[in-house]
């Protein structure tokens, strides 16, 4: 392709994204374009033989081991998906990860989130009195759930977002919870002397690069008999740095800085057991994440004027920028919905792994 044609194509895609941000492209057209992108990504990642598929996974894992723990923390420190207003968190349900939609009777984010968090507790074998660490705790939905459910436990959450810390501590005060500590820190740099009975890492490893270094760091915070429950989004077969595959790959290009998001394969983390050992592994349908985003989209649309005012006040932006930010969130929900419901939720999935600490043995 000539340089002129490439420049024209880039310009067309930039115009497309600008029109999407302004809400000038219909949801139906966005979904159609997303499906085209999904099929291109599947074609790119799916190899003709199982041996080639395995080789792709092993090469990907090898490349991760040569990287630093994470590349995006500074880039995304004030990213709009993390630094969000308290009132907006309440509108969307307070959690960016998937809820558990076990059947058609589950319709609200609150119910789905509670079901998923109860599943975490069950699979981690939580008991009242356990010390618990929630890495990348976000707006604190899991922290608060655990603090209310396990009154004798001490729950520590780590977030790199000051507004989230303030919100969680405010909720603890309102709920009269005294068993919560929130640490404001970059998880890749923070040093904690304490060790914990249970560690939760929900929707965080997708923002890491060197999984070996990350899991080694976590293992140092686990008691000898401690357990780690880790959840991540995944593809059934291939791992992906989520970089644009071409100039028209608008959805991979515009939501996160290029290459800062990792979507591992369903089996990727099984190859990183230097410091922790997998003792159980579950795969949940991608429909859970698809429906979560569908519900969030409806909640945003149902209070769109309120959301606009919230964004203008919190970020100190004008009406046009607030509209763009609302459309950014809407587009994120639409694309995630299409991605995770593809192939009836059996293409992109949710992986949950339970690890124990690997203890040093003397010979």
Curated annotation (Swiss-Prot):
Temperature dependence per UniProt: Optimum temperature is 30 degrees Celsius.
Binding site for S-adenosyl-L-methionine: 96-97, 132-140, 159-164
Reactions that this protein is recorded to catalyse: (S)-reticuline + S-adenosyl-L-methionine = (S)-tembetarine + S-adenosyl-L-homocysteine + H(+); (R)-reticuline + S-adenosyl-L-methionine = (R)-tembetarine + S-adenosyl-L-homocysteine + H(+); (S)-corytuberine + S-adenosyl-L-methionine = magnoflorine + S-adenosyl-L-homocysteine; (S)-tetrahydropapaverine + S-adenosyl-L-methionine = (S)-N-methyltetrahydropapaverine + S-adenosyl-L-homocysteine + H(+)
Keyword annotations from UniProtKB, A to Z: Methyltransferase, S-adenosyl-L-methionine, Transferase
SUPFAM superfamilies assigned to the protein according to its UniProt record, in alphabetical order: S-adenosyl-L-methionine-dependent methyltransferases
GO molecular function terms noted in the UniProt entry: S-adenosyl-L-methionine:(S)-corytuberine-N-methyltransferase activity
GO biological process entries: methylation
The EC number(s) this enzyme carries: 2.1.1.337
Domain of life: Eukaryota
Tissue specificity: Expressed in roots and stems. Detected in leaves and flower buds.
pH dependence: Optimum pH is 8.5 with (R)-reticuline as substrate. Optimum pH is 7.0-9.0 with (S)-reticuline as substrate.
Family as reported in the entry's similarity comment: Belongs to the CFA/CMAS family.
PANTHER family recorded: PTHR43832, S-ADENOSYL-L-METHIONINE-DEPENDENT METHYLTRANSFERASES SUPERFAMILY PROTEIN
Function: N-methyltransferase accepting primarily 1-benzylisoquinoline and aporphine substrates possessing a tertiary amine. The preferred substrates are (R)- and (S)-reticuline and (S)-corytuberine, but can also use (R,S)-tetrahydropapaverine, papaverine, (+)-bulbocapnine, (+)-glaucine, (+)-isocorydine, (+)-isothebaine, boldine, noscapine, narcotine hemiacetal and hydrastine as substrates. Involved in the biosynthesis of magnoflorine.
Protein name per Swiss-Prot or TrEMBL: Reticuline N-methyltransferase
The organism of origin for this protein: Papaver somniferum
UniProt lineage: Eukaryota, Viridiplantae, Streptophyta, Embryophyta, Tracheophyta
Gene: RNMT
